[in-house]
Amino acid sequence: MAVDTDLERRVLDLERILEVTRAIGSTVDLDELLGRIAAAATAVLDCERATVFLLDPERSELSSRVATGMADSPIHEIRFPVGRGIAGEVAATGRNVNISDPYNDPRFNPDFDRQSGFRTTSLLTLPLRGHDGGIVGVIQALNKRGGPFTSRDEVLLATLSAQAGVAVARQTLLEAAALQQRMRRDLEVARAIQQGLLPKHPPDLAGWDVAGWTQPADETGGDCYDWLQVPDGRLMIVIGDATGHGIGPALVSAEARALLRGTATQNQDLPRIVPHVNDLLGEDLREGTFVTAFIGFLDATEGMLDFTSAGHGPILSFSSASGTVTEHATHGTPLGMFPGMTYDPPSRVVLLPGDMLLLFTDGFYEWASPDGTQFGQDRLVDVVTRHRDLPAADIIRLVYDAVSVFARGTKQADDCTAVIVKRTTGPA
């Protein structure tokens, strides 16, 4: 009769373990699944309590995720560092601990008992391991009824701990996949917003061909370009490059663009606009973050373009008469780097029919081939010169194509943005 009873108990234990195994395949919620595992441990081991602790590797802490037998306890969460107490030691060493008299073991921490009024008389603690064998938590059973935990109990709890480890590992993968999907959606939204901030159409200027284009290195980039007809009739032209690439720099460049637009609608005086925007950005940006920028105002009738460089360069102009390219000095400090800075008086370039202003960010110049050689300014100038009779947008596309061929498969490391201002005819 006793044999039959023992056999029945073993069969019941196996059924409970199989029930947990089936639940792993059908239950997505981690807390529900761990709760089933803790309940199964309490029943199979015939003990008063079972707790599942999960490891926070960044903080090197264990925290109780689910527990049985604690409905009347004033403590709802237990959190402690790895290495402290029995559970902390198991998390640190990965070794099972089975103690029949915890209060006579120096590793036992009685603080929880004192706070809750509970009395621990025996405990069995095992690590939870993920797919790679790394420790992801600890499962602990307390106070076996009728005596200390046995070696058979240890085997049974090891089976449950393996299932708990699989559940935690699966949930970690699911959460990582969900996070990646959310980030992908967020990046797509951010990219759409950033693209929406770019000019939709070239400016309507008789005798002029103005084109802009950008290709971020990531989903979003720190480069921007813009143009805006201002109240005095001139065309403001901007190209900017915030440090880095990605969402953070994209926000910085968007703020710089908005500040320049807002300021230019009220004031078209470059010596006042640039320091003002520099100061406003300097208040917002953290140290080490800044925007290099070209800000120019084009008088389309006279062909005069006054500009200030806030750290952006090179600034190039192509002369149709001589077939040569001139590089203009760029002395200004990037926007947002040093609030209170003064800037040199604006420079001026006069564009005659066939002449071009060439603005390219460093993503073009610094894109390297597999041997580390950068595309550089000379190659860029050569492409522009050979295709000078084409529309501005086509020239930009051909430059990017040339850089891509030169790179021979190396990944684009920085955002590539360009603006070309080309005078096609003289004044009427």
What is each of the regions a protein language model found here?
Residues 131, 148-172, 254-258, 352-353:
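Amphipathic alpha-helical "output/dimerization" segments
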Residues 39, 49-78, 82, 103-104, ...:
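GAF sensory/regulatory domain recognition
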Residues 174, 178-358, 408-428:
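… and, occasionally, acidic/histidine-rich disordered N-termini of signaling adaptors
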Residues 61-63, 72-74, 100-122, 143, ...:
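Signal-transducing coupling segments at domain and membrane junctions
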Residues 1-26, 30-32, 43:
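Signal-transmission linkers at sensory-effector interfaces
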Residues 1-9, 73, 130-131, 135-136, ...:
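Regulatory loop-to-helix N-cap segments in sensory/regulatory domains
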Residues 121-130, 137:
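A short, aliphatic-rich beta-strand micro-motif
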Residues 73-97, 328-331:
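Acidic/proline- and glycine-rich, intrinsically disordered low-complexity segments
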